[in-house]
Amino acid sequence: MSIVAELKPTSTFSFKPNKHSVSDFALPTTRVESWKYTRVGAIDSNWEQAERNESIVALEKGIRIENGFIALPTGQISGVSFTAGKNLSAEQQGLVLSMLAKENRNDVFDAISEKASNDLVLIEIQSGKIIEETISIEIENTLSDCMSTPYMFIVSKENSIAKFTIDFKGKTERSFHLVQLHALVEQSAQLEIHQLQNTSKNECVLLRESISQSEKSVFKITTVTASGAWVRNELNIRIE
């Protein structure tokens, strides 16, 4: 069962962890509407989830995601909390599920993420906190034929200010990143994200971002793509 499926008491998923491959899912073989910006020929049925590595070298001031699994920072950032999926409180679980419910595409990519997600992290910026230092998120596949499917949730609470960098890196022969990022930007909060996608020419990246922001909040995002077999970025922003 995936990390997200475990949050849903009505789930009937029976998938075993770390045993999924792309061939388990009904990926499209023609250029249907939901796939029109992607070269379907780049899909590799050999992609599969890696085993969890308990010795990931964590960052001091940010998140390290290696082969889909998340290592929390070793240091503290004042005003910021990082919570792994397995440690979410009942209140945090409710928050995560409410954010997921806002963006329900019901397509094959959501099926992969929901049923075969590797890991999950919730990052919360406390109310009124101005975070001077940039929070780093480093994403890398170190294994060939690796299917990396993490979830990231960012909550910028009222009157807070925070900036993130998301750095995709890696030089594997073949691998697949399917990253789901959900952010909630509350009243008068500011959230800024800078992304660099610099994987090898044989790696595939699909980044799905769902942003919910209050009317008086500020959200900025910059994405630079340097390389990759195919890269697809989906960004949905809603004003609440």
Indicate where each model-derived feature is located.
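Conserved beta-strand/loop scaffold segments within soluble protein domains that form the structured core
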Residues: 91-240
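N-terminal leader/transition segments
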Residues: 1-149, 156-158
